[in-house]
Amino acid sequence: MNLIKHNDMKWNMTYKIAALLFFSLPWASVGVCAQSATSSQSPQKQKVQKRETYEWEGEIPTYVEQLKQELTYPMAWGNSSIKNFSKWKKAAREKVLECMMTPPKAAAAWDMQVLEEEQRDGYKAQKIAFNVNAYSRITAYLLVPDGGVSSDASSDIPSASSDISGATSFSGKGTGRKFPAVNLLHDHGAHLFIGKEKMIRPFGVLSAKKASVASLREANSSDSISDKEKAIAQEVLEDADAWVKLLYEGQYLGDYLAKHGYVVFSMDAPMWGERGRKEGVDRKKYDLIAGNMMMLGRDLSAFMTYDDISSTEFLASLPMVDANRIGCAGCSMGAYRSWMLSALSDRIKVGASVCWMITTDAQLTRRYGRKENGGFANCIPGLRQYLDYPHIASLACPKPMLFINGSKDHLFPIPGVEDAFRQMHEVWRSQKADERLDTEIWDIPHSCGIKAQAKILEFLDQYLKK
C-alpha cells in the first residue's frame, strides 16, 4: 500500500471514529452541528408523518407507569415466600435461567489454540481461539504474568463443561505458578467494530495473519500479509487506542491488571468485534438480529451471558489459573455483564461493575430526560415479572461486589442508582455480609478512568490475593 493511500485510509478512519465516539456518548453536544445543518449543501430533512393521536412517546408506551405499577417482583428476596436464603438463591437463579430461554449447546471440547503471542511489560499477550459453545469458535485475548504455567500445551486444557454454575472442578497440569484471574467484559458504546480490544490492547500489523480466524480455515494460505489485512489490523489498533483514550483515560484495563499479577481474559460478545456481521458494522441491525434470535426461541442478550459463563469455565480450566480465585469486571454493558455473571456463576468469587446499575422504574421513564430507554443488550423476556436489576445482582450475595456509578452519568439517573444500591444493601445486610458490598457514586461521567481502574485493582486484590 503506498503512503498516500495509507494516509487517506488513516484520516478517513480517524474521522469516522471521532464522529462515532462524539455522537454515541451521553455527554456529546449537538450544538456544534448547527452550522453544517444550515449549509446549502445539506440534504433537506425528510418530513415525519404524524397522526393526531398516538400511543408511544419516544421509545416508551404512554401507559408505561401503569405497566410498572404491575411489576411487583414477587421473587425478590424479602418478597418471595421462600425465607431460606440458599433455597431462595437456587429458585431465583433457576427463574432467571428459565427466562433466558434455551442456552447454546456446550462445546464438546474447548480445543484451544494459541494463534500468536508477544512479550509485554511483565506478562505475555496471546491471541487464542477456542470453542465457547457448540456453534461458535471464537478468538480471545489472554494475558499471562511472567512465571506462570504455559498455555501452549493444549493437552493440558480440560474438556468443556456443561455445568452452568461452575460446580465441576478442573485442575490443569504443568509446572509453574498459578495466578488469580479476571474475566474482563467489554462495553457497548454503540460501537461494535471492536469488543475485546476495548479491554486488552490488540496486536500490531505484523500479527494480523496468524491472529486472524481466516488463517485457521486456510491452513495452506501464504504467510504473507495482504494490504487489506494490514489495513484492517491498523484500523483495529487505532480504533481501540481512540476508544480507550476516550472512555478509559488511555489505559487498557486488561493490560493494567496483568502488570499487577492477574491472568486476564477477554472475548467479543455476540455482534461485537470478530463476532459481527459479514456485511460490516451496522448498529441499527442489532435489534433486528435480536428479534430474529427470538423467532428462533433464543435471546441474544442471554446468549451473551451464557457465553460469559462458558468462558469463565474455560478460564478456570487453564493450567496457569487458580480456579478458586477468579473475578470479573467491566464498564457500562461490561458492568451489566459482570454482575450478571457474578449472580449466575459460582466460579466467580468477586465482581466489579462501573457505570451500570439502575431500577426499571428509573430506566423506563421520561422523568429524567434520558435520550435512550432500555434496549436488547440487556433484555431478557419476562424477567421483570419476577425480578428487577438489583434483585438479580443480589443473587451474587454474599460475594464481595463493587459498584461505582457516576453523578454525571446521564444514562443512569442517580435516584434510580441510589434506590438500586439501597435494595442490594438490604440483601447483603440480611446475610450479615454488608461489608462485602461496596457501592459508590463518584463525580464522573459514563466512564472507567484511571482512578476507577485503581479501585477495581484494590478491590480484586483485597479478595483474590489474601
Regions found by a protein language model. Name each.
Residues 320-332:
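Alpha/beta-hydrolase fold nucleophile elbow
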Residues 135-138, 146-150, 172-182, 188-191:
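Proline/glycine-enriched tight loop/beta-turn segments at coil->beta junctions
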Residues 102-149:
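N-terminal cap/lid segment of alpha/beta-hydrolase-fold proteins
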Residues 376, 422-466:
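C-terminal catalytic histidine-bearing segment of alpha/beta-hydrolase fold enzymes
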Residues 288-295, 310, 350-393, 413-421, ...:
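Mobile cap/lid helix-loop segments that gate and shape the active-site cleft of serine hydrolases
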Residues 177-178, 184-306, 316-317, 362-365:
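Cap/lid segment of the alpha/beta-hydrolase catalytic domain
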Residues 403-405:
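Short beta-strand/loop motif that positions the catalytic acidic residue
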Residues 36-98, 102:
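N-terminal pre-domain segments of enzymes
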